[in-house]
Regions:
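Conserved catalytic core of nucleotide polymerization and phosphodiester-bond processing enzymes
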Residues: 1-274
Length: 274
């Protein structure tokens, strides 16, 4: 009974969240969503990834093996055309390795060597390096890539503070290049107020906060000086690696879409790494 209730809820959510929304925005059998390529007053992401609205086509389920294909099958190609679906394999982890290799960081060569196997799995590689389960390695990897704090990472892992400290220490000792890269990119953001993505696009850190820890509203420089005095620092620099990696992934994906268009293939939608 419990499984049937859960399934009913899942189907109802798919119907109300996806199908009804798609039909609401259908015009002569077509969907013309609002596409935000960069951050603006009406939407978009700070990293430069695409976002969609009215409807949000990125919310179409993909992981549900039954409902995902059913909903996707509602979208049909033009007559005489065929859909193609392409996605990157471990795009963001590979970018982390790329930037760590550019700086010649200690420990990254082991991952580079492992990647010579086309089927290599970054999270499994790191799990073996750190001697921890793959699930924990993946949680820590993604948490660090996305600028997740220690407390949130601990909660995601579902372990107590002492175990978390031991686990993080073991991870950083055996996979040192991730934290080294994270700290390096953070320093660049703090010193320069920006980091540059793969294609040279600037991700700016223009807001400021007081040096002391606590919950503070990030402000423009002059406002932060007036509010807190000279003891201020750039805000959100802990997310610098995330901006670099996601921003570079966005560059790479958009460049690929342009190249596809040049070859006569029309990109219709981009969802995450697909």
């Amino acid at each position: 009974v419990v499984k049937q209730i859960a399934r009913a809820r899942e189907i109802n959510k798919a119907h109300t969240t996806f199908i009804d929304t798609i039909l609401k925005h259908s015009h002569k059998g077509r969907i013309h969503a609002e596409i935000n390529q960069l951050r603006s007053d009406v939407g978009g992401t700070v990293t430069g990834r695409f976002s969609y609205a009215n409807p949000n086509l990125q919310q179409i389920p993909a992981r549900n093996k039954e409902l995902g294909p059913m909903i996707r099958s509602l979208f049909i190609p033009e007559e005489g055309h065929t859909w193609g679906c392409f996605d990157y394999s471990q795009q963001e982890p590979r970018l982390v390795v790329h930037y760590a290799a550019l700086d010649g960081l200690y420990g990254v060569q082991e991952v580079i060597d492992a990647y010579k196997d086309g089927e290599a799995d970054f999270h499994q590689i790191v799990a073996e390096m750190a001697d921890i389960p793959r699930s924990q390695a993946k949680t820590i990897n993604l948490g660090l890539f996305y600028g997740m704090g220690k407390n949130k990472l601990q909660a995601e892992l579902g372990i107590n503070e002492d175990k978390a400290k031991d686990l993080f220490k073991q991870y950083h000792n055996r996979v040192p290049f991730v934290k080294t890269l994270m700290d390096s990119v953070m320093r660049k953001a703090s010193n320069n107020g920006r980091v540059r993505t793969w294609l040279g696009r600037r991700c700016r850190f223009d807001l400021w906060e007081p040096n002391q820890y606590g919950i503070h509203k990030a402000l423009p420089h002059e406002a932060a000086l007036a509010e807190h005095g000279p003891g201020i620092r750039r805000a959100y620099t802990y997310k610098a690696l995330n901006r670099l990696i996601q921003g570079s992934a966005a560059d790479m994906t958009k460049k690929a879409m342009v190249e596809l268009h040049k070859e006569g293939i029309t990109p219709h939608i981009q969802v995450h790494d697909e």
